[in-house]
């Protein structure tokens, strides 16, 4: 076995364990904020692919505020962009906790600081673009699913997506946009890899219209959402369902809780698996390595697993402001690779150019693709994203 990771330590081969991941639906207040920030980013990139955007959003009852630093040639109609994003989520009436037509929008956007901008100047060539900030970023992949993504979070995301679809197509018309899910899976250890055996617990909370009873809601969610989303082979007589454990959930969205951009970074990534460097994604253009390097970290980890170099992989990258090349590259394969860490890092260096200005070209990150990443996770669920398409590695 490899010298990196845990070398198949005894406890990695014995017994089972439970692991849990949570997700939130597009109408969750923090997710509204993420989507509004990314809608503004997309509006900038649609007109000016070199826009520099750092846009935060805060929301509470009847109010949404966008604030941050944006340098762009785009002519932005903030009222239109923000209200359309809220409308698309489904908040079109104050009885649902928010209304895109009547909410108060505050805009506090300034140009990017010249001190930060000078660290990023486009030299003459995009390749020489320095990182927009210091920081550490992680990517993770696992062979437990065809998507090479943790099954706990995949199911949690899919449950929220199913509720959104049922609300939009009218099959569950009493559903409202604010939903939360949590899935616990029993796994077995397999020489450092993890193998899902069964779903142990499913938690679903869904904002709803006042006319449906809790009893009816629980029945409908179980039959029309959970059992149509999670394959029957994972559900057994011991599976526990906590559907609407609080009882009523009529008041939701920003009326129920305040929302902020960047508050759902574990939902956005790997659901507690792997590791996280702390940087959020939404509202940031590709020069912010918090986002672009996390995407390339996923691309690297997924490519390593897809190539059969490991069954599980965690990759860390680090950057400094104004410096193009990463300061460090780390990889841990949890004992599932027959290559050493040094060999794997060399394979990464030989196959990936990790300068932000090259990442943007290879992954096509100057396009207005970001609003869709802010719904149901940036990884695993949407295989059309460029970073979800493994690179053919030479080694």
Curated annotation (Swiss-Prot):
Q: What is its EC number?
A: 2.5.1.6
> Pathway of this protein?
Amino-acid biosynthesis; S-adenosyl-L-methionine biosynthesis; S-adenosyl-L-methionine from L-methionine: step 1/1
Q: How is the cofactor bound?
A: Binds 2 magnesium ions per subunit. The magnesium ions interact primarily with the substrate.
What are the binding positions for ATP in this chain?
A: 28, 178-180, 246-249, 257, 263-264, 280, 284, 288
Q: Which cofactor does it need?
A: Mg(2+); K(+)
- Pfam families according to UniProt: S-AdoMet_synt_C (PF02773), S-AdoMet_synt_M (PF02772), S-AdoMet_synt_N (PF00438)
**Entry-linked SUPFAM superfamilies:** S-adenosylmethionine synthetase
Q: Which InterPro entries match?
A: ADOMET_SYNTHASE_CS (IPR022631), S-AdoMet_synt_C (IPR022630), S-AdoMet_synt_central (IPR022629), S-AdoMet_synt_N (IPR022628), S-AdoMet_synthetase (IPR002133), S-AdoMet_synthetase_sfam (IPR022636)
Where on this chain does Mg(2+) bind? 22
What positions does the entry give for K(+) binding? Answer: 56
Q: Where does L-methionine bind?
A: 69, 112, 257, 288
Q: Which EC main class describes this enzyme?
A: transferase
| BP-aspect Gene Ontology terms | methionine metabolic process; one-carbon metabolic process; S-adenosylmethionine biosynthetic process
Q: Which domain of life is it from?
A: Eukaryota
Q: What catalytic activity is recorded?
A: L-methionine + ATP + H2O = S-adenosyl-L-methionine + phosphate + diphosphate
The similarity annotation says: Belongs to the AdoMet synthase family.
What the entry lists under NCBIfam families is as follows: metK (TIGR01034)
So what does this one do? Catalyzes the formation of S-adenosylmethionine from methionine and ATP. The reaction comprises two steps that are both catalyzed by the same enzyme: formation of S-adenosylmethionine (AdoMet) and triphosphate, and subsequent hydrolysis of the triphosphate.
Name of the protein this chain belongs to: S-adenosylmethionine synthase
Q: Which organism is it from?
A: Neurospora crassa (strain ATCC 24698 / 74-OR23-1A / CBS 708.71 / DSM 1257 / FGSC 987)
Q: Which gene encodes it?
A: eth-1
């Amino acid at each position: 076995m490899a010298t990196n990771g845990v070398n198949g330590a005894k406890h990695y081969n014995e017994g089972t364990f439970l692991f849990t991941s949570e997700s939130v639906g597009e109408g969750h207040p923090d997710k509204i904020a993420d989507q509004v920030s990314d809608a503004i980013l997309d509006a900038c990139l649609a007109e000016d692919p070199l826009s520099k955007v750092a846009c935060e959003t805060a929301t509470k009852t009847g109010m949404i505020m966008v604030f941050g630093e944006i340098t762009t040639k785009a002519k932005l109609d903030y009222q239109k962009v923000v209200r359309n994003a809220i409308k698309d989520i489904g908040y079109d009436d104050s009885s649902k906790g928010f209304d895109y037509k009547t909410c108060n929008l505050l805009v506090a956007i300034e140009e990017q600081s010249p001190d930060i901008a000078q660290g990023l100047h486009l030299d003459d060539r995009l390749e020489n673009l320095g990182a927009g900030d210091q920081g550490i970023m992680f990517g993770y992949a696992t062979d437990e699913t065809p998507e090479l993504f943790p099954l706990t979070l995949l199911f949690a995301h899919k449950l929220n997506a199913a509720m959104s679809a049922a609300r939009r197509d009218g099959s569950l018309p009493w559903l409202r946009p604010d939903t939360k899910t949590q899935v616990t899976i029993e796994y077995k250890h397999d020489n450092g890899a993890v193998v899902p055996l069964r779903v142990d617990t499913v938690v679903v909370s869904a904002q709803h219209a006042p006319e449906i009873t809790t009893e009816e809601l629980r029945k409908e969610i179980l039959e029309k959402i959970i059992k149509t989303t999670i394959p029957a082979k994972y559900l057994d007589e011991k599976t526990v369902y906590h559907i609407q454990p609080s009882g009523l959930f009529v008041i939701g969205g920003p009326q129920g809780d305040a929302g902020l951009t960047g508050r759902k970074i574990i939902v956005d990534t790997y659901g507690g698996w792997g590791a996280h460097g702390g940087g959020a994604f939404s509202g940031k253009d590709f020069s912010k390595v918090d986002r672009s390097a996390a995407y390339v970290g996923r691309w690297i980890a997924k490519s390593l697993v897809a190539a059969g170099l490991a069954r599980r992989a965690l990759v860390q990258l680090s950057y400094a402001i104004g410096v193009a090349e990463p300061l460090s590259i780390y990889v841990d394969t949890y004992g599932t690779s027959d290559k050493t860490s040094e060999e794997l890092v060399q394979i990464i260096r030989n196959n990936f150019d990790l300068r932000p200005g090259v990442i943007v070209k290879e992954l096509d990150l100057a396009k207005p693709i970001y609003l869709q990443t802010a719904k149901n996770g940036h990884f695993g669920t949407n295989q059309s994203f460029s970073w979800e398409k493994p690179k053919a590695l030479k080694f």
